[in-house]
Design a protein with these regions (language model features):
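Short beta-strand/loop motif that positions the catalytic acidic residue
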Residues: 162-163, 169-171
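Catalytic histidine-centered segment of alpha/beta-hydrolase-like enzymes
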Residues: 200-213
Length: 222
């Protein structure tokens, strides 16, 4: 069976995929790489890390949250395997200029934040017991490195027309900052399915793990 690779976002580590690994691994190989070190090295390093991982397989299914979703989109755009499947949550194909400028301004402020305060802000919306683990996992990501990554990710644009994989686009129904972007992404992926994760915010796979995992499992089985 095609392996499933789970890609975490900026404010979490691979431990945030615990509920999905537990639920999905009996049926298939599930891999959740630690991308924090790659994130600390920048966008290209993170993409290359995932590229190396996916190149070990003829076919892979990708599931990414937030920045992990953006990387999943980039990798899917580079691969031509039509039998693969792609699941992204709280991701986008490109930020509008105004929002991109806003993220760049936020990145400038991020550089000035004390490391401990920044990390606590990053994990603030993650439910326990995963919050404390995420706080430990993101330790290598300092303010300067995070600011650079924010600028680079905000400038990324994905050629969705190059994506052959069947796609499921998700977003937490309470993730107001990303709802419009997620819908726009789905509209740019021909034949994709869009679904809201009920009672979930940005970290939808933990906010409502049962609903998120159910949507993913149903899509993979279809």
């Amino acid at each position: 069976m095609t392996p499933l690779i789970l890609l975490h976002g900026i404010g979490t580590g691979p431990g945030a995929w615990g509920p999905q690994i537990e639920a999905l691994s009996p049926e298939r190989e599930v891999v959740a790489p630690d991308l924090v070190g790659a994130y600390a090295s920048g966008w290209e390093a993170a993409v290359e890390e995932v590229r190396r991982l996916t190149n070990q397989h003829r076919e892979v299914d990708l599931c990414g949250l937030s920045l992990g979703g953006l990387i999943a989109l980039q990798i899917a755009a580079e691969r031509s395997e039509a039998g693969e499947r792609l699941i992204v949550c709280a991701a986008f194909r490109g930020l509008p200029p105004g929002l991109r400028r806003r993220v760049h301004a936020m990145a400038m402020l991020t550089r000035l934040m004390p490391r401990g305060f920044l990390h606590r802000q990053l994990v603030a919306e993650i439910p326990q017991p995963y919050r404390n683990r995420a706080l430990a996992e993101i330790a290598p990501l300092g303010p300067g490195k995070l600011a650079r990554l924010m600028r680079q990710a905000a400038s990324a644009r994905i050629d969705t027309k190059s994506i052959a994989a069947r796609a499921l686009v998700l977003c937490g129904d309470r993730d107001e900052a990303n709802l419009r972007l997620a819908r726009d992404l789905a509209s740019g992926l021909p034949g994709s399915t869009f679904a809201l994760v009920p009672e979930a915010g940005h970290v939808a796979n933990l906010d409502n793990a049962e609903a998120f995992t159910g949507l993913v499992a149903e899509f993979l089985a279809s």
